[in-house]
């Protein structure tokens, strides 16, 4: 058979099982077969479950039958519950969104009005907390009712007894920070209690009654203030992050909540120096624009200059630029001079380079002669950033000399090493213990901007806000554990002692304002911040302080009322003594001229005294007390004097005991600050001061009754001195007595008339600087010797033996 004509099969060879097309077709057929088998299996499984589900759902389906009312009721109730749940969740979500919106508005606010509006709206959106869990409502309410009852009865003695018996700062835990957190205002009950106590204190201060004398009122206020305690503002370190303190202090100044005791270290000491050397009007004007120019770091220069400075001085920056800036800010004032001018207590912490010397808190009691700019420079000398500094002070002549000069009697041994000081935040960032011991401080407001502390405190606040009280307790436990381990390192003397000392200190106070620093701010921590960066940090400080105003007012309100009452009473006492002195002088002047011989010695005029080297007239010591308060006190006293016919009893007690932090409201306080320097610290000088003080307590009637005997005694004495009218006597000390140096009135008036004419009513009495004025001449018993010129100087030596 011929097969040559059969069809060819070469064209079908491309779809064979070994080709790509053939394999693709085979895979497709197999895949479709597998899907079909899987579909049948799934169908069988679903059919099985549907059969079982029908059996299970048949009772529930029967409940939905129209003839079954129970089933319909269950269905409707379930649907209503689900709808209500959905609605409540939606309302909560909307409320949370609104709270987040107002919080963002608070974080972006630039003025207190904007912030307070956002805080008020946030308070409305926030669920109310149960205040009974945070403080003793019953105790505070009962105490408030008792105070109101005693005030309505009108017994001043009962009011004083009640407040002296039980007036504490944290009554019933009403100063709990958790209670005031996120609040715009103080809780109503606590505000009523603070207002009631303040009202009764002012009522005691202003009431004119014979039941209570002015001296008794002042003693009551001083004792109550000492028992109540003081508030101090502490500013931490933080290099350029210290611009945060600007906003904190500015907010406290604007709301008149700035404490009179302020202390700090490192960059915080710079802000303390600004506050402690300016009067209240100067401080208010400082924050209006001049604070933008705070640039304390010099230009680092090139890499070779920086390396050379590090190799020679051990520091990156040159400290002379910082010293020059601080001199301009503080005007070469010492701690004592700043205290005399402003009435504020300034504290600056420094650490010694010596291993066994403890850190110090410099203030007007521990180091009155140290120059403030020197202390601030030493407190800013962080190792590696600035070199350690030597403290400078003023000597008796006013020259700036080393505070701890090397002393060695044997020249062969060589001079001792210089005592240098560095950053106080290394060992004592917040000098709480020292302030408690020296100034009776029991409440601290802390502004924390340290880069190694602030992040942990912010984290702890976040944990407390998100995790509740239990999480807050765990965070507190972790903090205590870290401090405990660091203290163990310090006690055992292990390596890294300096690092351990940074974390072993106290970080927080009763009210802690923590800086929310950003990462970009940490990168520029040792550089001069620009004006924009200073403004940003200051705004952060203001917003963080606005959040704490409620708790600060709760802690600080009664203390402010006590300070105001003490200031007003001291002002009234000065007016009273001035009026008594004027009345006594008027009575003496009305007597015959021949009887002025001894009476002239009874006038003790301290307003024209010759200030000693360490005594500056305080013209701005009223602090944050408004001028209208003092004016009201003056009007009140004038009303008292006119109504009583100027027949009030004279007071001869010129030495009262005050607490250590009294701001020297009474100029008669017998301490170093009012003693006129070393020459007036002897027993002889004290006897002479007591003698002159007793002269002021003599009544005109007693003077007239004893004039004849006194004139005879004066004429029979062989030791006398004649002083021309208008001249003044300055006290001095010798080896066996004291010396009175005569100063011509013409020279003194040329130097003192402009200042005295402006501040004569504000300068308090100081019995340490003595002036004896006489219409004709002054006579004092003792030995006298004339000067070589005969009219330039007169010396009187009196033997106390």
From Swiss-Prot:
Annotated EC: 3.1.1.3
Coiled-coil annotated residue ranges, if any: none
BP terms from Gene Ontology: lipid catabolic process
Location of the active site: 266 (nucleophile), 423 (proton acceptor)
Domain PNPLA: 233-436
Subcellular location(s) per record: Lipid droplet; Membrane
Cross-referenced InterPro entries: Acyl_Trfase/lysoPLipase, NTE, PNPLA_dom, Triacylglycerol_lipase_N
Name assigned to this protein: Triacylglycerol lipase SDP1L
Encoding gene per record: SDP1L
């Amino acid at each position: 058979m011929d097969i040559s004509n059969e069809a060819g099969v070469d064209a079908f060879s491309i779809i064979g099982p070994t080709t790509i097309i053939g394999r693709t077709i085979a895979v497709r057929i197999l895949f479709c077969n597998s899907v079909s088998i899987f579909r049948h299996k799934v169908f069988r499984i679903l059919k099985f479950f549907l059969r079982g589900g029908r059996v299970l759902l048949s009772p529930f389906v029967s409940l939905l039958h129209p003839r079954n009312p129970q089933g319909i009721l269950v269905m409707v109730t379930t649907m209503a519950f689900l709808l209500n749940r959905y609605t409540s969740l939606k309302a909560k979500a909307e409320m949370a969104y609104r709270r987040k919106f107002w919080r963002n508005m608070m974080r972006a606010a630039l003025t207190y009005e904007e912030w307070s509006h956002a805080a008020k709206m946030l308070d409305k959106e926030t669920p109310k907390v149960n205040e009974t869990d945070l403080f003793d409502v019953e105790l505070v309410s009962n105490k408030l009712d008792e105070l109101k009852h005693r005030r309505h009865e009108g017994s001043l003695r009962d009011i004083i007894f009640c407040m002296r018996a039980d007036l504490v700062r944290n009554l019933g835990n009403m100063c709990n920070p958790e209670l005031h957190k996120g609040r715009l205002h103080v809780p109503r009950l606590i505000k009523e209690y603070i207002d009631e106590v303040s009202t009764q204190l002012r009522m005691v201060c202003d009431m004119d009654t014979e039941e209570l004398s002015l001296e008794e009122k002042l003693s009551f206020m001083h004792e109550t203030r000492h028992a109540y305690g003081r508030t101090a503002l502490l500013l931490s370190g933080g290099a350029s992050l210290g611009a945060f303190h600007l906003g904190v202090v500015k907010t406290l100044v604007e709301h008149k909540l700035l404490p009179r005791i302020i202390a700090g270290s490192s960059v915080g000491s710079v802000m303390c120096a600004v506050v402690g050397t300016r009067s209240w009007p100067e401080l208010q004007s400082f924050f209006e624009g001049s604070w933008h120019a705070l640039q304390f770091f010099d230009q680092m220069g090139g890499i070779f200059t920086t390396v050379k400075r590090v190799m020679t001085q051990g520091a990156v920056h040159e400290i002379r630029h910082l010293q020059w800036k601080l001199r301009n800010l503080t005007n070469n004032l010492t701690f004592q001079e700043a205290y005399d001018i402003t009435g504020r207590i300034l504290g600056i912490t420094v650490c010694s380079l010596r291993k066994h010397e403890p850190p110090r808190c410099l203030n007007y009691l521990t180091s009155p002669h140290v120059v403030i700019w020197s202390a601030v420079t030493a407190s800013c000398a962080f190792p590696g950033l600035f070199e350690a500094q030597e403290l400078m002070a003023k000597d008796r002549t006013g020259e700036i000399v080393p505070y701890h000069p090397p002393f060695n009697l044997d020249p062969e041994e060589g001079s001792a090493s210089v005592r240098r000081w560095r950053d106080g935040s290394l060992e004592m960032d917040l000098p709480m213990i020292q302030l408690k011991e020296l100034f009776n401080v029991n409440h601290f407001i802390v502004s924390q901007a340290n880069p190694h502390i602030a992040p942990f405190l912010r984290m702890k606040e976040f944990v407390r806000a998100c995790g509740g009280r239990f999480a807050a307790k765990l965070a507190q436990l972790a903090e205590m554990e870290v401090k405990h381990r660091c203290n163990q390192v310090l006690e055992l003397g292990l390596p890294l002692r300096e690092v351990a000392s940074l974390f072993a200190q106290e970080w927080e106070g009763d009210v802690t304002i923590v800086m929310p620093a950003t990462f970009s701010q940490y990168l520029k921590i040792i550089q001069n911040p620009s004006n924009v960066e200073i403004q940003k940090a200051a705004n952060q400080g203001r917003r963080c302080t606005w959040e704490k105003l409620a708790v600060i007012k709760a802690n600080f309100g009664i203390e402010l009322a006590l300070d105001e009452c003490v200031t007003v009473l001291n002002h009234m006492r000065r007016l009273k003594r001035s009026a008594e002195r004027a009345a006594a002088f008027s009575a003496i002047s009305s007597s015959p001229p021949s009887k002025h011989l001894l009476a002239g010695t009874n006038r003790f005029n301290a307003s024209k005294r010759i200030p000693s080297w360490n005594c500056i007239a305080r013209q701005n010591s009223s602090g944050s007390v408004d001028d209208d308060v003092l004016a009201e006190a003056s009007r009140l006293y004038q009303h008292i004097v006119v109504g009583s016919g100027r027949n009030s009893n004279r007071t001869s007690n010129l030495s009262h005991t005050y607490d250590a932090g009294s701001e020297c409201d009474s100029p008669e306080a017998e301490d170093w600050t009012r003693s006129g320097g070393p020459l007036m610290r002897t027993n002889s000088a004290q006897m002479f001061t007591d003698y002159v003080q007793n002269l002021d307590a003599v009544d005109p009637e007693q003077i007239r009754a004893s004039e004849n005997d006194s004139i005879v005694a004066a004429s029979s004495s062989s030791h006398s001195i004649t002083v021309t009218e208008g001249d003044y006597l300055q006290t001095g000390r010798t080896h066996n007595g004291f010396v009175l140096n005569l100063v011509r009135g013409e020279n003194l008036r040329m130097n003192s008339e402009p200042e005295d004419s402006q501040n004569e009513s504000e300068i308090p009495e100081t019995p340490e600087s003595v002036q004896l004025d006489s219409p004709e001449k002054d006579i004092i018993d003792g030995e006298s010797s004339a000067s070589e010129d005969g009219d330039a100087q007169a010396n009187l030596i009196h033997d106390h033996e």
